[in-house]
From Swiss-Prot:
Subcellular location: Secreted
Any single GO CC term annotated in Swiss-Prot or TrEMBL for this entry: postsynapse
Main location: secreted
Signal peptide: 1-20
Family affiliation: Belongs to the FARP (FMRFamide related peptide) family.
Record protein name field: Pro-FMRFamide-related neuropeptide FF
Coiled-coil annotated spans: none
Phenylalanine amide: modified positions: F76, F110
Residue ranges, annotated region (Disordered): 22-48
GO molecular function, one term: G protein-coupled receptor binding
Length: 113
């Protein structure tokens, strides 16, 4: 989660918490209701705010490619680790393998039957 998403979530939580604390009647009505009943909030309100928060978190996630798609070890072959530049590409890459290459090469007959 990047900083913009975290800031948006924090602002959203503060707005939700502030709306629950003040309510539609303001602070005077809140004091009266606090004197009348000092019971905790019913579990339905907690579930509603939790489900709302869960929905908002899912909505904030950007649909895109999974992390498994971005990690592609097969792109450079199996069990390749370290720097491939030193192993495969060198200034004189063809000279060391010359004898091996020509021993495996078979003559090609282009166009002759």
């Amino acid at each position: 989660m990047d900083s913009r998403q975290a800031a948006a979530l924090l602002v959203l939580l503060l707005l939700i918490d502030g709306g629950c604390a003040e309510g539609p009647g303001g602070q005077q009505e809140d004091q009266l209701s606090a004197e009348e009943d000092s019971e905790p909030l019913p579990p339905q309100d907690a579930q509603t705010s939790g489900s709302l928060l869960h929905y908002l978190l899912q909505a904030m996630e950007r649909p895109g490619r999974s992390q498994a798609f971005l990690f592609q070890p097969q792109r450079f072959g199996r069990n390749t680790q370290g720097s491939w530049r030193n192993e495969w590409l060198s200034p004189r890459a063809g000279e060391g393998l010359n004898s091996q290459f020509w021993s495996l090469a078979a003559p090609q007959r282009f166009g002759k039957k």
